[in-house]
Structures are given as structure tokens and as C-alpha cells.
């Protein structure tokens, strides 16, 4: 009897451990993740003509995949609040797309901001330049964006069939059953040096559209169609565009103004910014990001901006950057760095300094 009691205790303890382990394993079971790419959609209680709406899900929301219909048109999902329902596949993107956006954010965490901008219409944030590329987040009208880089892509011609998108990878159990599933490793498709697409042997020339790599107020990074974004160019320098397109602008330094323009002007003296501005041709699809630069300095005597430096015929590549550097006897001066392609197509770095109204190219 003395031996039976310890044995029973041991068996009971083992059973409890196994039960707890099984429960933990079941409760911690991971599901395939999917994300809402539509602005907003709803979950239905069944896949049928007549159904009830059981929940509303919003753009960017993460959902757990429970199962799919045979034709993969509908997906059975669960929200973070534990609500189950069916949703159309076209309103979702997979974990692979979400991870591409995460990679874009990591890769461009320290990229210098080229300009501030505002969306003038609702627009989608894409993983790569192009209307037919995957998108997840939708940006509202009036949203503030930091511009990081620029590229271009061909616009689909009217009547042309859109490029087919690879199907979302099914769960592991379904993949074993479906031998025809094509699952490939996703890589970030961010182009650093855009190449003009090859024209078809016959047919019209492709229409090229500029795209911008941007970061929104929530830190999300992706590509937007450039024509849906307005640059927040300071009014005092916007008037000097001369029909060219401003693609980047930076404050190099601030200088004091000499006070009122006339005796009747009671405004006190203030500091005025001096700018580096990058320009390009007013047409999408250029092989360069910018082809000229101008430095605007302030004339305190005449209370106006003047062009202190101008350089044309550049094959420029974004991003550009600004800074400050100690030049011994000259003191600490503003500097700016450009990246341009030489005649061989190699991207080289050029560094300049601003000393008063004088800009000098520094020797490498």
C-alpha cells in the first residue's frame, strides 16, 4: 500500500503535465497571417447569397487565416478580438507583402529626407514602383509624407492585360496536398537605379510614370505615384522654378536679415533660411533624378533671394544630403553632397561647401 500511493501520485502528476503541455500546444498554435489591403471591409458569417455581417475590419489590420474555400475566393479569418468570419481574398494580402514593407522601412530608416510633401488624393502605398505591384496601406488625402527616393515605371496601356500576381502561398498542410503551388522566396523589389523598360517590337511606346519612395507619419515606407503628391515647397523659392520641376530642397543655413525694408515696416529682424534646390525636367520617366541644382542665398540689403550657384547638365541620383563641416580658418560651414553618374555610368560623389554667398566644389 505504501508503494501504491507514490505510484498513483507519479501517474497523476505525469498526466497533468501531459495535459498542460497539450493544452499549451493547442492554445499557442500559430495561424497563417493575412492583412487587410482594402480601405475597409466586413466579415460575413457564411459564404452564401444571404449572410450577416459580423465585424468590420480596417486597412492594415492583421487577421489569422483559418481556412479557404476551394476556389480561394473567400477566406475564413479571425480578428485580434476573436471574431470569426469570411472575407473576400481580393481585400487581403499575405505575410510576404507585409514583410516587404517591413524591409523597406528597415532599409530606409536612415535615408535622408529629400522633401516634405502632401497627398492631394487618397493613394495606395506600394512595395515597388508600378500600378500593378502589391499594395497594403492606403494613405488619406492631406497626409504628410517625407520623400526619400524617386524612380519610374511603365503605365499599362489601355486594353493591355494586367500582369498576373503570384497567388498567396497556402498553409503548409494545404501546400502538401497542392503540388502545383508555386511558392518562392520574396525579395525586396526596390530599384536603386531605374532602367528604362524595353519597348515592344511592335506597338505603341510605353508611358512612363514617376514614383516616389516615401515615409508617412506612422513610419511606414513604400512607393506612391508622384502625380498624387504635392511638394511642400516654400513659397519664397517656388517662384524661381522657371518651369522646371523641383524634386528636392534643403535648408543649408540661416542668416540674419537686416530688419525692416523701409521706415514704415515695423517687422523685427529675423533669421532667413538659405536653400539648396534640385530640379528636373517637367516630364515623367527621365533617366536621371535631377539634372540641375541651384543655391539660393539671402541678400540682406535688398531683402530678397538671389542665385548664388547654379549647375546644369547633371545626371543626378537621389538621395542628396546636407551637413556642416569645420574648415579651420574658414570656420564651420554648410556643406551638401550630391551623387551623379559620370560618362561611364558610374555613380560618383560630389561635395560642396557654402561660404557666405560663394559655393565651392571640394576636391575628392
Predicted regions mapped to residue ranges:
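Post-signal peptide N-terminal segment of mature Sec-exported envelope proteins
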Residues: 30-53, 58
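Short beta-strand elements that form the blades of beta-propeller/WD-repeat-like
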Residues: 272-286, 332-342
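Bacterial signal peptide processing site
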Residues: 24-26
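C-terminal motif of bacterial Sec signal peptides marking the signal peptidase cleavage site
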Residues: 19-22
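Bacterial N-terminal signal peptides that target proteins for export
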Residues: 1-12
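Acidic, small-residue rich beta-repeat scaffolds with periodic aromatic anchors
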Residues: 144-147, 179, 203, 237, ...
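Pro/Ala/Gly-rich low-complexity, hydrophilic intrinsically disordered segments
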Residues: 84-122, 131, 168, 204, ...
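SH3/SH3-like beta-barrel superfamily modules
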Residues: 53-88, 137-227
Amino acid at each position: 500500500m505504501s508503494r501504491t500511493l507514490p505510484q498513483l501520485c507519479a501517474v497523476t502528476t505525469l498526466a497533468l503535465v501531459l495535459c498542460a503541455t497539450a493544452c499549451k500546444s493547442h492554445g499557442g498554435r500559430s495561424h497563417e497571417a493575412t492583412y487587410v489591403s482594402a480601405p475597409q471591409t466586413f466579415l460575413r458569417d457564411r459564404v452564401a447569397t444571404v449572410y450577416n455581417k459580423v465585424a468590420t475590419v480596417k486597412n492594415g489590420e492583421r487577421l489569422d487565416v483559418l481556412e479557404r474555400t476551394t476556389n480561394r475566393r473567400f477566406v475564413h479569418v479571425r480578428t485580434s478580438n476573436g471574431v470569426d468570419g469570411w472575407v473576400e481574398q481580393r481585400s487581403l494580402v499575405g505575410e510576404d507583402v507585409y514583410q516587404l514593407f517591413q524591409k523597406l522601412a528597415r532599409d530606409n530608416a536612415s535615408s535622408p529626407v529629400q522633401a516634405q510633401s502632401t497627398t492631394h488624393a487618397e493613394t495606395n502605398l506600394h512595395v515597388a514602383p508600378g500600378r500593378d505591384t502589391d499594395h497594403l496601406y492606403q494613405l488619406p488625402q492631406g497626409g504628410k509624407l517625407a520623400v526619400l527616393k524617386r524612380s519610374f515605371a511603365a503605365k499599362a496601356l489601355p486594353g493591355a492585360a494586367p500582369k498576373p500576381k503570384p497567388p498567396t502561398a497556402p498553409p503548409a498542410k494545404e501546400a502538401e496536398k497542392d503540388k502545383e503551388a508555386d511558392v518562392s522566396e520574396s525579395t525586396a523589389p526596390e530599384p536603386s537605379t531605374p532602367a528604362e523598360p524595353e519597348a515592344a517590337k511592335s506597338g505603341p511606346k510605353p508611358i512612363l510614370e514617376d514614383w516616389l519612395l516615401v515615409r508617412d507619419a506612422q513610419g511606414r515606407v513604400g512607393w506612391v505615384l508622384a502625380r498624387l503628391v504635392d511638394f511642400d515647397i516654400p513659397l519664397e523659392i517656388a517662384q524661381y522654378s522657371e518651369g522646371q520641376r523641383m524634386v528636392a530642397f534643403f535648408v543649408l543655413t540661416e542668416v540674419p536679415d537686416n530688419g525692416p525694408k523701409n521706415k514704415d515696416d515695423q517687422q523685427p529682424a529675423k533669421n532667413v533660411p538659405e536653400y539648396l534646390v534640385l530640379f528636373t525636367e517637367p516630364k515623367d520617366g527621365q533617366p536621371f533624378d535631377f539634372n540641375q541644382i541651384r543655391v539660393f542665398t539671402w541678400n540682406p540689403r535688398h531683402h530678397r533671394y538671389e542665385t548664388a550657384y547654379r549647375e546644369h547638365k547633371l545626371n543626378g541620383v537621389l538621395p542628396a544630403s546636407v551637413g556642416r563641416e569645420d574648415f579651420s580658418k574658414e570656420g564651420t560651414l554648410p556643406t551638401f553632397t550630391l551623387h551623379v553618374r559620370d560618362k561611364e555610368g558610374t555613380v560618383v560623389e560630389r561635395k560642396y561647401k557654402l561660404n557666405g554667398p560663394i559655393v565651392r566644389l571640394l576636391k575628392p
